[in-house]
UniProtKB/Swiss-Prot annotation:
GO terms for molecular function: ATP binding; catalytic activity, acting on a protein; histidine-tRNA ligase activity; transferase activity. This is Histidine--tRNA ligase. Belongs to the class-II aminoacyl-tRNA synthetase family. One of its GO terms (biological process) is histidyl-tRNA aminoacylation. Its EC number is 6.1.1.21. One of its GO terms (cellular component) is cytoplasm. Pfam families: HGTP_anticodon (PF03129), tRNA-synt_His (PF13393). It comes from Pelotomaculum thermopropionicum (strain DSM 13744 / JCM 10971 / SI).
């Protein structure tokens, strides 16, 4: 019986993986331009980190985490998101003792036991940034502007940036009371999860996707109407900075991110072309998270982008990305006598930084040339016994169909010039 991949996962194969690599390289480039340094955290952490950091009333903790007990009896969880691990790394490695703010970015797989569908998987990939150590509203605006800049460089269109403020520990009690007063008469109609969250965090009810809960919550109080003076001032400054940067936005008074650690600014980017899973990224400020995870009071802000969602949006908008590229050179041989010379040339090409390959199935010369075309080789170098005696090889431009005789001792330089000229054009 054939073993298949687990449900909710994907194999990223040649032809597709180049698109992923391109997006990741563009993300790394923009992160460097904005002053961020890369961080790589373990794909699994102690479960306690997510219980404390993500919030025990969230869907992630209650229903979606991959948690197991290891052979040492420790509870371990595959990371469902990377903000809490970044906080743990910030504290454990004493990054708070160095120059502030600390600006980090990451790229990697996350894991959630979710219902697989278009744009949603159990192993999915995120690109994200975190900034620790600054209360400045300009940082909130920067991460949003950076996200929109990145999408723009990929060519994505029809995007909407939704922003909101979800308050802070000073103004949250007022919001909590108003929400509880509003939802209390409807408590029996709420779903089981929302009823369990009612006392501890009624704000999470606004994020529920159940139709009945969404209908009941349609007229619920807005967080933005309960903001303290400090939060209101912070939000106004965020908006002014976005306007200064010419970043279009919509204030979405209903926006509540699905994680408990957010304070002040929350935002989400949506694409109109990808159906139900329209969100392609989001984030916000989390000024209390570092403290919750055992560190000193430290402000933070960040965002994460879903790589699969980005690819889906690009596809829906008909935006092409670099696909599979074959070797720049394929060595086709005629006769066993030329094999030693061909093998040596193959490795000289590779040492010169030219991607090259050859036949390993003892095909005929005609079959080798057909194979070179199928794998997308740019040039074929044909080495036959008669050419070798004359100290030459034949170089064929596979796209143009043109063929030239080239001295064997000059073929490396010839190909280098051809390939360089092609790349520049």
């Amino acid at each position: 019986m054939l073993t298949t991949r687990p449900r909710g996962t994907n194999d990223i194969l040649p032809g597709e993986v180049e698109k992923w690599q391109y997006i990741e390289s563009q993300f790394r480039r923009i992160c460097r331009e904005y002053g961020y340094g890369e961080i790589r955290t373990p794909v699994f952490e102690h479960t306690e980190l997510f219980l404390r950091g993500v919030g025990d009333t969230t869907d992630i903790v209650e229903k979606e985490m991959y948690t197991f007990t290891d052979r040492g009896g420790r509870s371990i969880t595959l990371r469902p998101e990377n903000t809490a691990p970044a906080v743990r790394a910030y504290l454990e490695n004493r990054l708070y003792a160095g120059p502030q703010p600390v600006k980090l970015f990451y790229a990697g797989p996350m894991f959630r036991y979710d219902r697989p569908q278009a744009g949603r998987f159990r192993q999915f990939h995120q690109l994200g940034v975190e900034v620790f150590g600054s209360h400045d509203p300009a940082v909130d605006a920067e991460v949003m502007a950076m996200a929109m800049d990145f999408y723009g460089r990929l060519g994505l269109k029809n995007l909407e940036l939704h922003i909101n403020s979800v308050g802070c520990p000073v103004c949250r009690p007022l919001l909590r009371r108003r929400l509880q007063d509003y939802f209390r008469p409807h408590l029996e109609r709420l779903c089981k999860n929302c009823r369990s969250r009612f006392d501890k965090n009624p704000l999470r009810v606004l994020d529920c996707k159940e139709a009945a809960c969404a209908e009941i919550g349609a007229d619920a109080p807005f967080a933005i109407d309960c903001l303290c003076e400090s939060c209101l001032e912070h939000f106004e400054k965020v908006k002014k900075y976005l306007e200064l940067l010419n970043v279009s936005y919509t204030v979405n008074r209903r926006l509540v991110r699905g994680l408990d650690y957010y304070t002040h600014t929350a935002f989400e980017v949506t694409a109109r072309d990808i159906g139900a899973q329209s969100s392609i990224g989001g984030g916000g400020r989390y000024n209390g998270l570092v403290e919750v995870c055992g560190g000193p009071p430290t402000p933070g802000v960040g965002y994460a982008l879903g790589l699969e969602r980005i690819i889906l949006a690009l596809r829906q908008q008909g935006i092409g990305l670099p696909g599979e590229s074959g070797p720049e050179v394929f060595l086709a041989t005629a006769g066993q006598a030329v094999m030693p010379e061909a093998f040596g040339l193959l490795f000289r090409l590779r040492s010169a930084g030219i991607s090259a390959d050859k036949d390993y199935l003892d095909r005929s010369l005609k079959a080798q040339m057909k194979y070179a075309g199928k794998i997308g080789a740019r040039y074929a170098v044909i080495i036959g016994e008669s050419e070798l005696k004359q100290g030459t090889v034949l170089v064929r431009d596979m796209a143009a169909g043109e063929q030239s005789a080239v001295k064997l001792d000059g073929v490396l330089q010839y190909l280098r010039e051809k390939i360089t000229g092609r790349k520049q054009s």
